[in-house]
Amino acid sequence: MERIVLLLAIVSLVKSDQICIGYHANKSTKQVDTIMEKNVTVTHAQDILERTHNGKLCSLNGVKPLILRDCSVAGWLLGNPMCDEFLNVPEWSYIVEKDNPINSLCYPGDFNDYEELKHLLSSTNHFEKIQIIPRSSWSNHDASSGVSSACPYIGRSSFFRNVVWLIKKDNAYPTIKRSYNNTNQEDLLILWGIHHPNDAAEQTKLYQNPTTYVSVGTSTLNQRSIPEIATRPKVNGQSGRMEFFWTILKPNDAINFESNGNFIAPEYAYKIVKKGDSAIMKSGLAYGNCDTKCQTPVGAINSSMPFHNIHPHTIGECPKYVKSDRLVLATGLRNVPQRKKRGLFGAIAGFIEGGWQGMVDGWYGYHHSNEQGSGYAADKESTQKAIDGITNKVNSIIDKMNTQFKAVGKEFNNLERRVENLNKKMEDGFLDVWTYNVELLVLMENERTLDFHDSNVKNLYDKVRLQLKDNARELGNGCFEFYHKCDNECMESVRNGTYDYPQYSEEARLNREEISGVKLESMGVYQILSIYSTVASSLALAIMIAGLSFWMCSNGSLQCRICI
């Protein structure tokens, strides 16, 4: 009994100093996904997917877009009378066309290689319209009667502003031979056309000659078109059709026209004065009097995030498009606040069960307790190394994904619908693969980040363990219990790696041996007490059984026979 009292006295007098390794925790509810887990709560995370836009068409880096309103590109370039506001346009950053603009080819017909022309506009920022063949120069032909009710203007018949529909004059249509030399330093976009009458009567009525042609030639073009006379249903009140063509005339090159009828001659051409990144966007939005660096058909994006899921077609300095709904990068640690029922310390790195909300100036650090008090201290060196390692994470992901598939909206005419459908399938396939790669990379980076933090905590723990050696014992929860007194100066030496093991080793050895001796003696006492307790319990049980038997025999409840 005296030894038990001695043990209790020693335990009550000795309150060991402790130092613990831990990590930061906060009230964050941000969650990330990793390869192995979903919805992992972390202290810090960065959303890298932009989901919002302003719903407006904006200027791009200070340059307004060319919004064609109810006009198509064809209506603008040919000069549909309902598109007069676009006869002369300033520099544009991109072109906006509605899905089905009502003011296109007012006189029914077709525009050859229309999609290629639109592709050309995707690398053009400014046209300068110049006159190449004046209307007044057609003295042998009627250059004013070529109008149609299909192209009305102020209630009267009119025609495309930038070309001239030549009709016979005085019942004659002399063969046309005209040339134009491009003496400009810029390329020229030139447009012309041919009229396909409804019947032979219309052919001779307009052009006198029953058999006609239109020939056009440059150093790279050799084209001869013949009118196709056929009965057709009326469109916009017209049974005839018009077919338009275009070419790019290089500087110092010449274009030659020859025709004896059905010729729609160019009056104006477009000098391509500025080339650059542009686009034709399909959108019904209006101009929002705003400026942006990134524009989509559904609105402008103003974001520094590396990815977006708003629309695959963009122009400008834009985040990369993915089909994902969520991309969040872990930049902090697993957020596991300490549990009060487990005490202060408790497992990141496999042995610490909770983070410290009290440590706010670092990701990893220490908590100590001694006679002078207790407190937290962040490990600035390991925290800074971790911050440096994670700061460039977003740029790293972008660098790894530098082969993004750029979705380009291509348009195809009715004869190329199969190609269009194939293009869309290929584009969707590329975007699916691109999105999968981004999502996988984010999952892997998140796994790597959390493992990185775990490793840093474990390294900090090992740093302390290697310093203290047998001067302290590991408690198994990230803490060490000193076998010697460790004041604040001693604690600081452990934290900064200058702990003097020999200085404290003798005191630690004596305390360690004393505690071990008390434990051994107490084990002997416990063994004696256990034997005594067992014997006493057995004797008491035997006396109870004997007494019960004697009582039952005396009242006849139990018969006892003794045989000799």
Curated annotation (Swiss-Prot):
Organism phylogeny: Viruses, Riboviria, Orthornavirae, Negarnaviricota, Polyploviricotina
Post-translational modifications = Palmitoylated.
UniProt keyword Protease, yes or no: no
Q: How does it sit in the membrane?
A: Single-pass type I membrane protein
InterPro entries of this UniProt entry? Capsid_hemagglutn (IPR008980), Hemagglutn_HA1_a/b_dom_sf (IPR013828), Hemagglutn_influenz_A (IPR000149), Hemagglutn_influenz_A/B (IPR001364)
Subcellular compartments: Virion membrane; Host apical cell membrane
Which parts pass through the membrane? Answer: 528-548
Its name, as the record gives it, is Hemagglutinin
- Alphabetical list of Pfam families matching this protein: Hemagglutinin
Share what the entry says about its subunit structure, partners included. Homotrimer of disulfide-linked HA1-HA2.
Instruction: Using the record, list the residue span of the signal peptide; answer none if the entry has no such feature.
Output: 1-16
Under SUPFAM superfamilies, the record lists: Influenza hemagglutinin (stalk), Viral protein domain
Segments on the Extracellular side according to the record's topology features: 17-527
Q: Name one GO biological process term.
A: fusion of virus membrane with host endosome membrane
State the family named in the UniProt similarity comment for this chain.
Answer: Belongs to the influenza viruses hemagglutinin family.
Organism name: Influenza A virus (strain A/Chicken/Scotland/1959 H5N1)
Site (described: Cleavage)? 342-343
Gene Ontology CC, one term: membrane
Question: What more does the entry say?
Answer: Major glycoprotein, comprises over 80% of the envelope proteins present in virus particle.
